[in-house]
């Protein structure tokens, strides 16, 4: 927010990049609050949604003023500020054997077809890290760019998925 205040001192344009899980509520809500302040009424926003590494690249090149993404390993020339924590959940089709369980061990991901995130996404990288750390060998049947795609495939019984609890899950229930 401080960076956005600095960029918008006399109106102007702010280019921001963000990851999909922030698109449904977080980014629109924060930008609306920012624009509702009288001193910011002349600011124009350009929005760009992508994976964390792509956002990082555009922030570094100056194409984006601010980026919102998953944590990347410490980089001396970039600052990272945690804004939100999202619980990870295993998403199953309605009639799936795991669908009745309130708590499901991560190890179950090795017993069913898995719908994952694109490899270059932060969540795809993180999920692969978790699977390796806990020696889980998932049967990854497809990789998707976003939560909408993942939820749609889960609904159609393609498999189960590990994803952050986002507003798309509330709509899917």
Task: Mark where each language-model region is.
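Central regulatory/effector-binding core of bacterial HTH transcription factors
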Residues: 11-75, 144
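Alpha-to-beta junction loops
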Residues: 41, 59-68, 88, 136, ...
